Amino acid sequence: MGHKKYLVLLFLLAWVPAWSQVRLEHASSPQGHEALVVENRLARYTFWSDGGVLASVYLYFAPYGTKATEVVPGWDKKELLPGVSLPLEIELLGEGEGVYPDLYGIKAERKGAGEVEVRLSWQGKGLTVEKRFFIAGKAVYLVPVEVRLSGEAKGLRIILGHIPTGSKAPRIVSLCDGKPVDGFPSEEARGRIEGIGLVDAGTVYFWKFPQGLPRGTRLFHGVNRAGQPVFGLLVPELSGELILETAFYGGRNRYVLLEKAGLSSLIKLNVFGRFMVGVIHFLQFLYRATGNYGWAIIIFTIVAQILLFPLTRKQIHSMAKLQRLQPKIQKLQEMYKDDRETLQKQLIELYRTEKVNPLGGCLPFLLQFPFLILLWRAIFNSAELFHLAPSFLWIPDLSLPDPYYIIIALTVGVQLLGQWLSMRRIPEQKGQGIGWVMPILFGFLFRSFPAGLWLYYFIYSIIQSTLQAIVYWELSHKGPAKAG
C-alpha cells in the first residue's frame, strides 16, 4: 500500500502548478519620488512617477546560455545615460514646450492572482494623461498598454524609446502591412503601421499597434530636449480625446516567443531553424495533451527511438557479434603480432565473412546527435515556456539544470548497467575501462545542461540498455565464437 501511495505522489508532483503570482514592491526613483516595481516570472518592470515612464524592464530569468539583461534602451549597466528619454515620456510642443507633466500618480491594482494593472495618471492645465499597463504573472514578455490623452494641446510627442548608437547598437525595425522594414518607413512606402522597435541578436524591444496608429498620429524620429536620439509618435494637435492601444514586447529574441506575441515576421528562419521550430511545436502539442513538458519529452524520446529502431537494433546486433568474435580476434592478434599489415588484412576478411561492422558500436550513439541537438536548441529557444509550465517530479524547471543532480545520477547509473550487460559475457580486454569512465565523465562535464535534455538522455539510455539485454539474450544460446 505504501508503494502505491508513493507512486501516486510522484505522479501528482508532475502536475504541481508553477508560481504565477505577480509581485509588487514600492520603491523610490533616483530623484527620490515614488516608484513601483512589478515582477512576474520572467521580468522585473520598474515604473517612475517622474514623467510617468516605464523606466526599466529587467529580464532576470536567464536560461542556459544567456544572462540577465536590461531591455529598455539608454541604460549602461545600472546607470541611466544622461539626457536619455524613457518609454512613454510625453513631450509637449509649441507653447510650454518640454517634458510635461513631470510627476505622475502611481496606482497598482490586482486583477486576480495572476495579473496586475499599473496606472500612471496626471491632470492639470487642461490636459489629462493616463497610462495603463497590464502585467500577467505568466505573460511571455508581452504587456498590453493603453495611453489615454484628453484635453487641448498644440502638438505633443509620445516617446517610445531612446535610439542607441554605435557599432553594437540594435537595428530599428518597423512593421508595415505585416512585413518588417529596416529603419523608418518612407512616407511614400508606408502602408498600415503595425509596430516599431529595436531588434538585436539577444533581445527585442518592440511596440506593436494591433489596431494601427490612432487617427491623426504618425511615427517620428529625432532628438529630445537633451539632444538624445528618440523615436515615437507625433500628435500634431490634440483636441478632445486620443487613445493609443499598443502591446509592448520587451524580451528575448526567440522565434517561438515572438510567434506567441504575433511578431514572428521579425525573424527569418533557416532550414535548421524550421526543423527546430517543428520540434518545439511538436513538444507544445504533447504538452497540451499531457499537461507537462516532462511527459512531452518522454513521449518525444520514445517516438525518436521508434523511428531509429531498425538501424539501432541492427547496429546493436553488429556490436554483439563483434564482442562474440573476440576469441578469434585475439587469436589473430597473437598470430600476427609482429606483422600489422597482415593482421589488418585478416581482420578485414574476418569482419567481411562474419558480416560485422567494427564501427557499429558507435553508430547507435551517433544517431542520437541530430535529436539531441534539435531538442537542446528547442529547449533553449522556448525555455520561457518550460519555465512557466508545471514542475516535473522533483525538477522545478526542465529548462534549467537539475538542482539535485538526480536525473544525471540516474542516467549515469543506467549507462553503467548497460556497460556491465555488454561486457559480462566477453573476455576481459584492453580498453574496457574507458567504457566505465565515459558515463561518469560525461555526467560531470555536462552537469549544467538543462534537465530536459538529461531526461531525454535518461529515457534513451533505458531503451538502449533494454535493447542490448534483448539482443544479448538472443545470442546467448549460440555461445562465443571458437578461436580455431
Predicted regions span which residues?
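Bacterial N-terminal signal peptides that target proteins for export
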Residues: 1-7
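Conserved acidic functional residues
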Residues: 2, 113-116, 368
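Helix-loop-helix
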Residues: 7, 14, 18-21, 47, ...
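A generic structural signal for solvent-exposed, polar alpha-helical segments
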Residues: 12, 53, 81, 106, ...
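N-terminal, polar/Ser/Thr-rich
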Residues: 22-28
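Soluble non-transmembrane domains of integral membrane proteins
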Residues: 28-30, 36-264
